[in-house]
From Swiss-Prot:
Function: Catalyzes a salvage reaction resulting in the formation of IMP that is energically less costly than de novo synthesis.
Encoding gene (name): hpt
One Pfam family linked to the record: Pribosyltran
Record's subcellular location: Cytoplasm
Enzyme Commission no: 2.4.2.8
Database matches in CDD domains: PRTases_typeI
CC annotations in GO: cytoplasm
Name listed for the protein in its UniProt record: Hypoxanthine/guanine phosphoribosyltransferase
Gene Ontology BP terms: IMP salvage; purine ribonucleoside salvage
Top-level lineage group: Archaea
Keywords, ordered alphabetically: Cytoplasm, Glycosyltransferase, Purine salvage, Transferase
Single Gene Ontology MF annotation: hypoxanthine phosphoribosyltransferase activity
Length: 190
């Protein structure tokens, strides 16, 4: 499983953003081209290995949207997008996030206390976005049933788990070594 995803990751270019090694990939960046076969592999993996006994799928703008869309179409479960701009709706929750290469505000709408959710994201790397979103979800008092990242880079998973006490799982684990993506394993190999 995940053979197309793994192959595409190994072939992904790596660019430097300051001291941060940033791999450029369709699932994490939307470029150069998001092919349906890889997106389907991702949706199949999350629906197979994730706990889908939820009311809502939650994703973060922008690169979680295509993952949540594919997953929603596959499962029939609606999704909520954590957005980068405020809509000023009643109950909107603002979240400050800081990653290895940016920082800013995120806004959560459409969730209520007691909602059972799965949080899906493209990548967990520095943990900044996921930590901020998980803390906000806890404050809203949703039931965080599962957290799945398509890609786990470096120690991001451990950083998030240490900061939030929430278990994070990923489909594929990788590191960037000497400017190249190296696959370290996948959830179906565990």
């Amino acid at each position: 499983m995940f053979e197309k995803l793994k192959k595409s990751l190994i072939e992904a270019p790596v660019v430097k953003k300051g001291d941060y090694d940033y791999f450029v990939h369709p699932i994490t960046d939307g470029v150069p081209l998001v092919v349906p076969e890889i997106l389907e592999e991702v949706a199949d993996g999350v629906s197979k290995f994730g706990n889908m006994n939820v009311d809502k799928i939650v994703c973060v703008e922008a690169m979680g949207i295509h993952i949540a869309t594919a997953l929603s179409l596959k499962t029939g479960i609606p999704f909520v997008v954590v957005r980068k701009r405020s809509y000023g709706l009643e109950g909107e929750v603002a979240v400050h996030q800081m990653t290895g290469y940016s920082e800013g505000e995120l806004y959560i709408n459409g969730l209520n206390s007691g909602d059972r959710i799965i949080l899906v994201d493209d990548v967990v790397s520095t943990g900044g976005t996921m930590i901020a979103v998980l803390k906000a979800l806890k404050a809203i008092k949703v039931d965080i049933v599962d957290v799945m990242a398509v890609i786990e880079k470096g120690k991001g998973k451990c950083i998030v788990e240490d900061a939030t006490g929430v278990t994070v799982r990923s489909l594929v684990k990788l590191n960037v070594v000497n400017g190249k993506v190296v696959i370290k394993g996948s959830i179906d190999e565990s």
